[in-house]
Amino acid sequence: MNKSQQAGFTLIELVMVIVILGVLAAVALPKFVNVDDDAKQAAVNGVAGALSSASAINYASRKANSGKGNSVANCTDVANSLQGGLPTGYVITAAAITPADTTKTDCVVTANSKTANFTATSIN
């Protein structure tokens, strides 16, 4: 008498695997949902860093040769020094930089309800 053996998983084993995968998904999903907010903040921080760098480079260029660079009297003027301009959807809060020459001030850039500060240096 030959008894054939069947290979495979039992129903209980399959159900347990599905339950374990469900628990793992429930634990991991909230971590991936918040990544979107972190990415938006990182993008705004990157633009703020680029604006700070553009302001410093513009200041050095204009100080070395008054014919180069852009005059900066308020925070929004820094966008003119940024190569390619300010990206679409980003807004710089207008704030005067006083006194008018060689003063550093903190400015704010906003996009997607996220904000970041950057340093602007005024120069005539």
Q: At which residue positions do the language-model features occur?
A:
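Periplasmic/extracellular, small/polar-rich flexible segments of pilin-like filament-forming proteins
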Residues: 53-124
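N-terminal leader/signal peptides at the extreme start of proteins
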Residues: 1-9
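Aliphatic-rich helix starts adjacent to a transmembrane/signal segment
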Residues: 33-47
